[in-house]
């Protein structure tokens, strides 16, 4: 089963901003009904793009610094953080959507299909995990 990581105010930079892979971040809260609908879609992304794209969850109530830093005003917010820098040398600006989106819409919104692991990478990761 693919791993979904949980980021805190203290671990967000390492898990997301300094990651060498693209990261889909689910900003959520325990009391948020629509956030519960998003969880299975995050599991699908984590499984389908395992090894190529990381999935991270952030509880906005428990981690207010992250929410404020990225101006998260509504939840669920799903954000996509691309590694590296743009042509000007600045980090890519994260893309985000508010509300539930099925896997197919998230793939299109964030152009995720370009990050699918190559079959050789998948096989070597499965072999090294065994």
Predicted segment positions?
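Hydrophobic beta-strand anchors of alpha/beta hydrolase catalytic cores
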Residues: 24-25, 55, 78
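Short pre-active-site segment immediately N-terminal to redox-active cysteine/selenocysteine motifs
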Residues: 20, 28-31, 74
């Amino acid at each position: 089963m693919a791993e979904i990581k949980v980021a805190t105010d203290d671990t967000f930079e390492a898990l997301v901003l300094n990651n060498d892979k693209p990261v889909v971040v689910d900003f959520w809260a325990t009391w948020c009904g629509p956030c519960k609908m998003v969880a299975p879609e995050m599991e699908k992304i984590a499984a389908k793009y395992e090894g190529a794209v990381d999935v991270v969850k952030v509880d906005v109530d428990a981690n207010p610094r992250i929410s404020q830093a990225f101006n998260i005003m509504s939840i669920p917010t799903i954000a996509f953080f691309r590694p590296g820098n743009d042509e000007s040398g600045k980090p890519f600006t994260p893309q985000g959507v508010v509300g539930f989106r099925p896997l197919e819409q998230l793939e299109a919104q964030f152009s995720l299909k370009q990050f699918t692991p190559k079959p050789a990478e998948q096989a070597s990761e499965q072999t090294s995990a065994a």
